[in-house]
Amino acid sequence: MSDRKIINDPVFGFINIPKGLLYDIVCHPLLQRLTRIKQLGLSSAVYPGAQHTRFQHSLGAFHLMSETIKHITAKGNFIFDSEAEAVQAAILLHDIGHGPFSHVLENTLAGGVSHEEISLMLMERMNKDMKGQLNLAIQIFKDEYPKKFLHQLVSGQLDMDRLDYLRRDSFYTGVSEGNIGSARIIKMLDVKDDHLVVESKGIYSIENFLMSRRLMYWQVYLHKTSVASEKMLVNTLTRAKELALRGVELFASPALRFFLYHPIDKKEFYNSPDCLENFIQLDDNDIWTALKVWSNHSDVVLSTLSRGMINRKLFKVEVTSSSITKARKEEILSRISKQLNINKKEAEYFLSISSIENNMYKKEDDSIEIIYKDGSTRDIAKASDMLNISLLSRKVKKYYICYLRSENDGH
């Protein structure tokens, strides 16, 4: 019998998963749940090819981790088999706490608990079932293990998570800017004093990686239409929750019903086992099915928003460098309340104002150290002659004003 499973991945080709702990994790219901959650949430409203799942991403990140371990050990860095297995387990599980449309759900139904916190709760739960086999993986995930570079490979400036999602999201969206040379970057990685370093000849690959990341953020992750559909979904779920707490009957799967009909805050999410039980039953299907049914609900606000999501009649978006004036806000709200024959308070569900800040490189987060032939190291910000790190480190702030289109306003 074969000692491994081989999975064919469109981005990296054949991925080998050894039988035993790692294959058990891949087959675990909590990881299989990620096959029903899209990696890019609502980005398919802009890039129809972006249908890939968080499960595919987890496998890709695992594959890159396996390659990295090979290259790092080939350079004379000693890694125990138990450490290699643990860091591979940690990367397989790094996204296990994501819900459907992750950030939307965190902010509307899950009481503000982040997916990282939920990932850890689920890892600890799996560890009990697996009789402590994930102890080391959890230590690495929490950055409590002495070999710091192992944590950096799971969560850092050059982690396997980023190296996979930039390549994968680029592949499925068709936005070629994200197509980084992950294989070359991995070949250039080394370890010094238990921290990750990059050989100086890999400097151009790192520059390309940082630029790609910035381009992908503005072109894909923060694309104005994706932001608009996300805001629309936030408002739809917020309205549904408001109606539910007023006792209005709404169609929902049992797991979604739990979150709609219970006011949940962070404390309760941590203390009530029901919260986690219901959370792991949720995936994209719960949300889409509810939206389809809500499209015909008697509440005008809920049905209009739900139809907008289902039929891609999304909010109109304006991106500006300064916030909206009070007068402009009033003008939009009164137009919407007339258009839908609803009051001003209800009209607020059809207007969303937010600002987004992004800087691609925060030195304090986790700098990228370049190592030279003589063993000395310098931060990429100082080592790079081509890359304007001061530009990449600068905060870019944009204001997004999303609102219901007027009736005579097409797409």
Mark where each language-model region is:
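Histidine-centered, transition-metal-coordinating active-site segments
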Residues: 1-86, 100-106, 110-411
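Short alpha-helical catalytic segment bearing the HExxH-like zincin motif
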Residues: 87-92
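Short active-site segment of divalent metal-dependent hydrolases/proteases
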Residues: 93, 97-98
